[in-house]
């Protein structure tokens, strides 16, 4: 009788642990090369679904979000609500001020003088001069191979399903 009780208690504990894990975390497998070199295709991530609800999303946080086709994508935040965004000569400008992107150092070193990010402004790609309230402008680290806000516009905060802070 005791063995059966402990066996059932163990099974219930495992089932509950799996349910809690699935309720709190999202398993994400990186597909494609748009986040190279930060994340490689096939990397598996366990991301807290609720962390962004209790803290502010910052520039350069990496977010998981529901993309235009409702598929979960991974990209880096470069534009926050109310900001202007521009790239010129491979440099990011936010509200007219140059902002360093240390996570691109490796890509820039191997690009042999060619630009990692093509020139554009937020107005060029979205028709608006500022990132709208409640939205974020996101791009992949491997800019040449990334389908991101330059193509589908800023993402809605409500479509963010998880945040990875301080990833470089």
UniProtKB/Swiss-Prot annotation:
GO terms for biological process: signal peptide processing. The active site is at 34, 75. It catalyses: Cleavage of hydrophobic, N-terminal signal or leader sequences from secreted and periplasmic proteins. Keywords: Cell membrane, Hydrolase, Membrane, Protease, Transmembrane, Transmembrane helix. Residues 27-168 are extracellular. Residues 1-6 are cytoplasmic. This is Signal peptidase I V. The chain crosses the membrane at residues 7-26. It comes from the Bacteria. The gene is sipV.
